């Protein structure tokens, strides 16, 4: 493989940062362009200190700016597209989510054609496959089975339509006469250091006497460590660039999981944080069917009030289903086509994540000490 270059969108995000840190170690890599709307100062500093022979360029720009994207893609060999808005709680306007997740993906696909970028990897999500009902059990599902989300909620809908656009773009003719090859990765729920979801949950527990909120005790999930998700993207980039592997990877999607034990989301949260004295709420909780119908009732109230008042329910039907389904997938196809084997073991992932949670606990205590002085 001759010298090559890569653009990573969403490079300042949870997954994007990990991809950058791994990517700069790749052989023959000449340049990495890290694109995000805004980079935090600490991320800029971290990227500037990366030990690499490759040139690392940070670009701050909007995924909705088509002209900017075309310039960012000039001279690039591979695009890894992770930029997205993740919102399953209906916090953001629907159109904002559709603009970033769907229109933004369409924009960068068009930029790849205009700039003659031959390889495109999309960071999708298992949410594009469901779950559609907490009553339907899917354990160790795989790509040959047809699973497709039927939710109209903005996040799963936008990611599903964006993935379809990416896979449909495979085989597109580039401006220089070449061919665009694409693939999509569908990670499970991603955990690890700097997880925005874990941060919110841990800080909420610390403000609630160390009690973790119970949200998904009925689920069976196979969460995946962020380092392994990043590794899968590196292997996908290699696969699309390797003439021997590319034929099998083009136009394909892959479920990305690892060897994290299958467990409920609540059990995962407890396992990762119990060393620091955090514990699950042991009080009585609503039965799952009743919780679902309460969510439906709250969504109905929200809809009826919309002309007069913007009421956002604390939970919704999609979130209840997502958090409480038995829904797991195998990574065997990624292993077969990409050579994917988890880089980080469960024990190591658990230790690293727990240590990071410890820093959040310590920061919280320091904040309380400062306020009490």
From Swiss-Prot:
Keywords: Endoplasmic reticulum, Isomerase, Lipid metabolism, Membrane, Mitochondrion, Multifunctional enzyme, NAD, NADP, Oxidoreductase, Steroid metabolism, Steroidogenesis, Transmembrane, Transmembrane helix. The keyword NAD applies. It comes from the Eukaryota. One of its GO terms (biological process) is Leydig cell differentiation. It is found in: Endoplasmic reticulum membrane; Mitochondrion membrane. Its main location: endoplasmic reticulum. One of its GO terms (cellular component) is cytoplasm. InterPro entries: 3Beta_OHSteriod_DH/Estase (IPR002225), Lipid_A_modif_metabolic_enz (IPR050177), NAD(P)-bd_dom_sf (IPR036291). The chain crosses the membrane at residues 288-308. It catalyses: a 3beta-hydroxy-Delta(5)-steroid + NAD(+) = a 3-oxo-Delta(5)-steroid + NADH + H(+); pregnenolone + NAD(+) = pregn-5-ene-3,20-dione + NADH + H(+); 3beta-hydroxyandrost-5-en-17-one + NAD(+) = androst-5-ene-3,17-dione + NADH + H(+); androst-5-en-3beta,17beta-diol + NAD(+) = 17beta-hydroxy-androst-5-en-3-one + NADH + H(+). It is a single-pass membrane protein. The active site is at 159 (proton donor). Pathway: Steroid hormone biosynthesis; Steroid metabolism. NADP(+) binds at residues 10-15, 155, 159. Its EC number is 1.1.1.145, 1.1.1.270, 1.1.1.210, 5.3.3.1. Adrenal glands, kidney, testes and ovaries. One of its GO terms (molecular function) is 3-beta-hydroxy-Delta5-steroid dehydrogenase (NAD+) activity. A bifunctional enzyme responsible for the oxidation and isomerization of 3beta-hydroxy-Delta(5)-steroid precursors to 3-oxo-Delta(4)-steroids, an essential step in steroid hormone biosynthesis. Specifically catalyzes the conversion of pregnenolone to progesterone, dehydroepiandrosterone (DHEA) to 4-androstenedione, and androstenediol to testosterone. Additionally, catalyzes the interconversion between 3beta-hydroxy and 3-oxo-5alpha-androstane steroids controlling the bioavalability of the active forms. Belongs to the 3-beta-HSD family. This is 3 beta-hydroxysteroid dehydrogenase/Delta 5-->4-isomerase type 1. The gene is Hsd3b1.
């Amino acid at each position: 493989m001759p010298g090559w270059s890569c653009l990573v969108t969403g490079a300042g995000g949870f997954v994007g940062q990990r991809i950058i840190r791994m990517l700069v170690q790749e052989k023959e890599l000449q340049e990495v362009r890290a694109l995000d709307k805004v980079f935090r100062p600490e991320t800029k500093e971290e990227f500037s200190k990366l030990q690499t022979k490759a040139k690392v360029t940070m670009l701050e720009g909007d995924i909705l700016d088509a002209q900017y994207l075309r310039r960012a893609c000039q001279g690039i060999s591979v695009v890894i597209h992770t930029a997205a808005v993740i919102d399953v709680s209906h916090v953001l306007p629907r159109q904002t989510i559709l603009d970033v997740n769907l229109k933004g993906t369409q924009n960068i696909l068009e930029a790849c054609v205009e700039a003659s970028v031959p390889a495109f990897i999309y960071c999708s999500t298992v949410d594009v496959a469901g779950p559609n009902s907490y009553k339907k059990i899917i354990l160790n599902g795989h790509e040959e089975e047809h699973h497709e989300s039927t939710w109209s909620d903005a996040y799963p809908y936008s990611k599903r339509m964006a993935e379809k656009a990416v896979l449909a773009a495979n085989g597109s003719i580039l401006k220089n006469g070449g061919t665009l090859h694409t693939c999509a990765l569908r990670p499970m729920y991603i955990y690890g250091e700097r997880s925005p979801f874990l941060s919110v949950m841990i800080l909420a527990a610390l403000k609630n006497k160390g009690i973790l909120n119970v949200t998904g005790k009925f689920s069976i999930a196979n969460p995946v460590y962020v380092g392994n998700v990043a590794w899968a993207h590196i292997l996908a980039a290699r696969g699309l660039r390797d003439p021997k592997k590319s034929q099998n990877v083009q136009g394909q999607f892959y479920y990305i999981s690892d060897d994290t034990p299958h467990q409920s989301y609540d059990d995962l949260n407890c396992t990762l944080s119990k060393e620091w004295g955090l514990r699950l709420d042991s009080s009585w909780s609503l039965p799952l069917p009743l919780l679902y119908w309460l969510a439906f009732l709250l969504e109905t109230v929200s809809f009826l009030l919309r002309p007069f008042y913007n009421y956002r329910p604390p939970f919704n039907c999609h979130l209840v289903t997502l958090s409480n389904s038995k829904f797991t997938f195998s990574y065997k196809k990624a292993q077969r086509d990409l050579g994917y084997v988890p880089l980080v073991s469960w024990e190591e992932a658990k230790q690293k994540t727990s240590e990071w949670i410890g820093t959040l606990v310590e920061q919280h205590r320091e904040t309380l000490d400062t306020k009490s002085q």
